[in-house]
């Protein structure tokens, strides 16, 4: 297993959102998180990524194994597409941004400042950064927001390539990504007692993307 979660309890601020969450993910496997809006999918991903401490339970994985992509794109607007990828590649100790450029068809945009991109183009750049992290576990929160059908397919192809290389992915999404071997986990049974799934405080978007 590349990641094992045991009896995890998660909180957003002072409110407990989830309890008793247990699952594991193996190399080459994708896990799709399901549940209604506000159920705690974002909170769970933030906790897995180490951005929010768990209230209880354990998360077991190799050190520095997780790359987290949140709702917000978190790009450096003044840098070009290529410069954004180079910046992150340098941080993560990788050298070649060409595979990331190719995977998300960013070559025509390579010299354009990120601040001038459309919403869909920004999302493609944000997701392309996953390929320069070198990290085996991708934790992705609604990754296809702002993507059209063609680029959703590109994203799915990038995930499949990552899985074939021995990586893993945990994805919160409401759409079918076309990943035939992906497992699903409905987190609704893990919603903390007394907290309605519709509570907006339970699961608001993270605005400081880890990537």
UniProtKB/Swiss-Prot annotation:
CC terms in the record's Gene Ontology section: plasma membrane
Record GO terms (molecular function): ABC-type heme transporter activity; ATP binding; ATP hydrolysis activity
Binding positions (ATP): 35-42
Residue ranges annotated for the ABC transporter domain, each copy included: 3-211
Topology relative to the membrane: Peripheral membrane protein
Keywords, in A-Z order: ATP-binding, Cell inner membrane, Cell membrane, Cytochrome c-type biogenesis, Membrane, Nucleotide-binding, Translocase, Transport
UniProt-listed SMART domains: AAA
UniProt function note: Part of the ABC transporter complex CcmAB involved in the biogenesis of c-type cytochromes; once thought to export heme, this seems not to be the case, but its exact role is uncertain. Responsible for energy coupling to the transport system.
PANTHER family: ABC TRANSPORTER I FAMILY MEMBER 1 (PTHR43499:SF1)
The protein's name in its UniProt record: Cytochrome c biogenesis ATP-binding export protein CcmA
Species assigned in the record: Jannaschia sp. (strain CCS1)
């Amino acid at each position: 297993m590349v990641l094992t979660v045991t009896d995890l309890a998660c909180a957003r601020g002072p409110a407990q959102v989830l309890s008793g969450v247990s699952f594991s993910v193996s190399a080459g496997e994708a896990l799709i998180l399901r549940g209604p809006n506000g159920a705690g999918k974002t909170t769970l991903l933030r906790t897995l990524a180490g951005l929010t401490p768990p209230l209880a339970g354990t998360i077991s994985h190799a050190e520095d194994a997780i790359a987290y992509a949140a709702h917000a794109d978190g790009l450096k607007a003044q840098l070009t597409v290529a410069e954004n990828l180079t910046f992150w590649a340098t941080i993560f100790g990788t050298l070649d941004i060409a595979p990331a450029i190719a995977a998300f068809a960013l070559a025509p945009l390579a010299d354009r400042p990120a601040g001038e991109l459309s919403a869909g183009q920004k999302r493609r750049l944000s997701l392309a950064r996953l390929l320069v992290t070198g990290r085996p576990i991708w934790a992705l929160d609604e990754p296809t927001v702002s993507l059209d059908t063609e680029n959703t397919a590109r994203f799915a192809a990038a995930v499949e390539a990552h899985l074939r290389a021995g990586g893993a992915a945990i994805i919160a999404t409401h759409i079918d990504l076309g990943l035939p071997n992906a497992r699903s986990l409905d987190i609704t049974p893990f919603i903390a007692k007394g907290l309605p799934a519709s509570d907006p405080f339970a699961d608001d978007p993270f605005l400081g993307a880890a990537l």
